A protein has these predicted regions:
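Non-ligating segments of multi-cofactor redox enzymes
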Residues: 1-257, 263-299
Length: 299
């Protein structure tokens, strides 16, 4: 693949921040609701957004997929969540964790926090914590809502209710600021989740995307598809000089040369931007994501 074509992948990576901002705006398009202290409840809420974004955010244009999934499995008339499961499979098989890197509002929030100029710490020696998000997915998103039910057979959305910091950031805080009744109803659970939010904020300043790496069940779901998704990262080993700049640049602690489509890769493109030989690029369905007379060039 020539240099002209390689630059397309690099440009996508370079404009990632803008793409994240636009995705966050589209996910929360009803901005006037912040001043009204109300939640948008139109037809858009019947559709899930790809990233982690609280249903209760006043500006939210769609439903959170994790919240929607818990609502189904926790229902007193539980049936297999065909729509939500199909949604996960469709996006996972198509994009994998590209969604985490480019389309998730809470991922962008962590990226912005990490830009605050302070000493940064590596998570290289904390890789074991990666598996925590899978435990949270199975226990708090699936098992608890399904098995721990009330007298009429309804289960709580345990992850949203007891763990998710996005709910406090986007939902509880803005709604309480505009509604005295909500402020008066805030209690110990709000305090507990606020502590989680503050902890994630502090950790995000010091470490790169700790919530994505260790806690997020949505990232856990998308990670299952990273190795088979239509969008992938390709390393041209015949061009590689073994400088390891790509692996050093990866803040998700992925060895790019060995496993470019590792479950932890959020496809941010940092490895592409530092490669001196332009040997790393995006592919879609086995074809280069690049220009060649306005067509996709075959691998």
């Amino acid at each position: 693949m020539d240099k002209k074509n390689t630059m397309i992948s690099k440009k996508i990576a370079q404009f990632r921040g803008w793409i994240q901002g636009i995705a966050t705006l589209l996910t929360n398009i009803h901005l006037p609701n912040f001043f009204k202290g109300k939640i948008y409840q139109g037809n858009g809420k019947k559709i899930c957004v790809p990233g982690l974004n609280c249903y209760s955010c006043p500006a939210a244009s769609g439903a959170c997929p994790i919240g929607a999934f818990q609502a189904v499995v926790g229902s007193s008339h539980f049936k297999f969540a065909y729509y939500i499961t199909g949604f996960f499979i469709l996006l996972g098989v198509t994009l994998g964790r590209f969604i985490c890197g480019f389309l998730c509002p809470f991922g962008w929030f962590q990226d912005l926090l990490h830009k605050i100029p302070t000493k940064k710490f590596s998570t290289e020696k904390l890789k074991a914590l990666r598996y925590l998000k899978y435990v949270i997915l199975v226990v708090f998103v699936i098992l608890f809502p399904m098995l721990m039910t009330n007298a009429i057979g309804m289960g709580d959305p345990f992850f949203c209710k007891y763990i998710c910091p996005q709910g406090v950031l986007e939902g509880a805080i803005p709604l309480s600021l505009g509604n005295a009744a909500i402020r008066s109803a805030l209690g110990k659970l709000f305090t507990f989740k606020s502590v989680i939010l503050v902890s994630v904020i502090v950790l995000s300043i010091l470490f790169y995307r700790p919530f994505c790496k260790w806690i997020c069940p949505l990232g856990a779901i998308y990670s299952l598809f990273n190795k088979v998704s239509l969008l992938s990262i390709q390393v041209e080993h015949d061009k590689c000089v073994g400088c390891q700049q790509c692996t050093k640049a990866c803040k998700m602690d992925v060895n790019v040369l060995k496993t470019p489509n590792h479950p932890e890769c959020i496809r941010c493109g940092a490895c592409m931007k530092v490669c001196p030989k332009n040997a790393i690029h995006y592919q879609f369905m086995g074809k280069d994501v690049s220009k060649d007379k306005n067509k996709l060039k075959e691998k």
